[in-house]
Amino acid sequence: MEYFIYNIENLTDAEYEKWFSLMTEDKQEKVSRYKSLTRRKCSVAGEMLVKNHIGRALNLAPESLIILADENGKPYMENCRTKFNISHCENILVYAFSNEEIGIDIEKIKPISLKVLKSFFSENEQEYVSGNVLNADNPESYNSPEILERFYRIYTLKEAICKKSGIGIKGLKDADALPFLDQSFKENDYIISIIK
């Protein structure tokens, strides 16, 4: 398993235009509908980086490779044993490769809402995040650095589990993240989780 981190600010206009033009017509339409330039750049950069990596590994021209998506949006390449997954948050893109199914997610550590915690986390996950110090009367208690890091570890693990399995975020509530805490790490102000 390998993973990479890429800042899309490094994507030149020429690279963006070249790789956008090499996307399928459907993908070009999808990317063009994104209102955010950052999101458009992440989509194009993700495709460029994955194709370059797999192209080098298979000794194929990256431009000849086509990334498809299954019914749940999970990316894949036909006739390719290498599995990959991509995620982005703001200007940071992460992508991972493996010989097995893989899921990756990244989130920037920022204040949270208890509503998300209660809606998508099991009781055990809520207890792990809170460390039994959450105080409903004191909203600041759930935005301490330790609580936030725990929250984003669980959240990104749940997303990575769902992405690996291909079920999408509809399985977020049922994904059990606690057994995979060692597959999550902090990188600057971000939490990254990789499930293989």
Language-model features, listed with the residues they occupy:
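Core catalytic alpha/beta fold that binds nucleotide/phospho-ligands
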Residues: 1-196
